[in-house]
UniProtKB/Swiss-Prot annotation:
Site (Positions MEP for the nucleophilic attack): 160, 216
Upper lineage: Bacteria, Pseudomonadati, Pseudomonadota, Gammaproteobacteria, Vibrionales
Protein name: 2-C-methyl-D-erythritol 4-phosphate cytidylyltransferase
NCBIfam families associated with the record: ispD (TIGR00453)
Biological source species: Vibrio vulnificus (strain CMCP6)
Domain of life according to the entry: Bacteria
Length: 237
C-alpha cells in the first residue's frame, strides 16, 4: 500500500429506497446472517487498515439506522442524505470539508455491496496513489452485449472489448470530487456514479479490475448470492 495513503475516509450513500427489491424496507436494511446489508458493508470498510472513518449518508426520516449497533460507533458518522445518490455523496463531502483534519482522498462505496474484498481495496489504493485523477473498481464485460431499439428488439451487437462494469469503491481526491459533483448538479447533468462526474469534466479515471463477487444487492435473487459469498468467506476464516 502506498505510504501517501495510509489513512482514508469512506463515504457510503445509504438514502435509497431500493424499490426493485419489493421488500418492506430499503434493501440496505435487509438481513444476512443476523446483520443488515449496511452493517456488513460498513464493517467490511472499517476493518480495512487504511480506512479510519466511514461517513454514511442516510435519509433524515430514516427509522432504521438509529436502531443499528453501528450507529453508536465512534468512527462512523451519519449525515443527511439527499434525493439522489450524488446529493448524498455531496452531503458527506461537505461534512468532511468542515473538519479540522480534512480528508485528501475518499472512497465512495455502495451501501448494498457487502462483499467487497480487501485485496480489491488494496489494488484500488495502490493504483490511485500514482494516478492524477483517481479510479474505480470494475470488471470487464464477458457477455455478448446487445443494444435495443424502442420496441425492445435487438438493434445491433455492441463490441464488448472495451466495455467494463463499474463497481465501487470509487476513489478520488475529496476536493476534486466535491467540485465535480457540485458543478455537474448545477448544470443538470445526470450523475449515476462518482466517475461520471469526473468524466463530465474531461478527466480520465483509472479502471482497476476487481472481483466479480463484489455484487450490488438490487434484485431479490441477489440476496441469496450475497449470502453465499459472505458464508464462503466466513468458512475460510
Amino acid at each position: 500500500m502506498a505510504r501517501s495513503m495510509t489513512s482514508l475516509v469512506a463515504v457510503v450513500p445509504a438514502a435509497g429506497v431500493g424499490s426493485r427489491m419489493k421488500a418492506d424496507r430499503p434493501k440496505q436494511y435487509l438481513q444476512i446472517h443476523g446483520k443488515t446489508i449496511l452493517e456488513h458493508t460498513i464493517e467490511r470498510l472499517l476493518s480495512h487498515p487504511a480506512i479510519t472513518q466511514v461517513v454514511v449518508a442516510v435519509s433524515e426520516d430514516d427509522p432504521y439506522y438509529s436502531e443499528l449497533a453501528i450507529a453508536q460507533h465512534p468512527d462512523i458518522v451519519r449525515v443527511a442524505g439527499g434525493k439522489e445518490r450524488a446529493d448524498s455523496v455531496l452531503s458527506a463531502l461537505r461534512f468532511l470539508s468542515l473538519q479540522q483534519q480534512k480528508a485528501d482522498w475518499v472512497l465512495v462505496h455502495d451501501a448494498a455491496r457487502p462483499c467487497v474484498a480487501h485485496q480489491d481495496i488494496d489494488a484500488l489504493i495502490e493504483r490511485c496513489s500514482s494516478h492524477e485523477t483517481g479510479g474505480i473498481l470494475a470488471t470487464p464485460v464477458r457477455d455478448t452485449m446487445k443494444r435495443a431499439n424502442a420496441q425492445q428488439m435487438i438493434d445491433h451487437t455492441v463490441d464488448r472489448n472495451a466495455l467494463w462494469h463499474a463497481l465501487t469503491p470509487q476513489m478520488f481526491k475529496a476536493e476534486v470530487l466535491t467540485d465535480a459533483l457540485s458543478d455537474a448538479l448545477a448544470q443538470g447533468v445526470a450523475i449515476t456514479d462518482e466517475a461520471s462526474a469526473l468524466e463530465w469534466r474531461g478527466e480520465l479515471p483509472a479502471l482497476v479490475q476487481g472481483c466479480s463477487s463484489n455484487i450490488k444487492v438490487t434484485q431479490p435473487e441477489d440476496l441469496a448470492l450475497a449470502e453465499f459469498y459472505l458464508s464462503r468467506e466466513k468458512d475460510r476464516k
